A protein has these predicted regions:
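Compact, glycine-rich, soluble single-domain proteins
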Residues: 96-99
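Short, surface-exposed, low-complexity cationic segments
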Residues: 101-103
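Conserved binding/recognition cores within well-folded domains
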Residues: 1-85, 89-91, 132
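N-terminal regulatory/sensing modules of transcriptional regulators
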Residues: 1, 7, 20, 108, ...
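Short, surface-exposed secondary-structure junctions/capping segments
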Residues: 61-65, 105-112
Length: 132
């Protein structure tokens, strides 16, 4: 991975802008176009997924060759659909969905209370010698 950046430049014929990386929900590919679905709407530019992926943080997961999802924007995964916090939905194929679900579950396990490594020792300290 290259250096993480805060903004991605989006340049096309009709407009140019910078998109805050943390505002991206997901990125899909349509032929040679990259479609950035953000908190503020859809932005498109020409480019390659591999090029963009190098600059994204660890919360971004490439679940298929043509799709990158920002796990920090995902609210829930269910029935092969990814539900985002802002109400957007993304339907995935089986392979992509399984890959994303595994990574999302691992992402969730890093959040409190599951991330607390002391949890096991605290649980042992909470019980007396009789195991109660």
């Amino acid at each position: 991975m290259e250096k993480e950046i805060k903004y991605l430049p989006i340049i096309n014929r009709s407009d140019s802008c910078k998109v805050k990386v943390s505002d991206i929900c997901y990125i899909t590919r349509d032929d040679r176009k990259l479609l950035f679905d953000t908190e503020y709407g859809l932005k498109t530019t020409y480019g390659k997924m591999n090029t963009v992926e190098r600059y994204l943080g660890p919360e971004f997961v490439r679940c298929m060759s043509g799709c990158i999802v920002n796990l920090s924007k995902v609210r829930e995964t269910k029935n092969m659909i990814v539900y985002f916090e802002n109400g957007k939905e993304l339907k995935l194929g089986r392979t992509g969905y399984v890959r994303l679900k595994q990574r999302f579950n691992a992402y969730l396990r890093k959040m409190p209370p599951w991330d607390d490594k002391k949890d096991d020792t605290n649980r042992n300290e909470d019980t007396d010698n009789d195991g109660h």
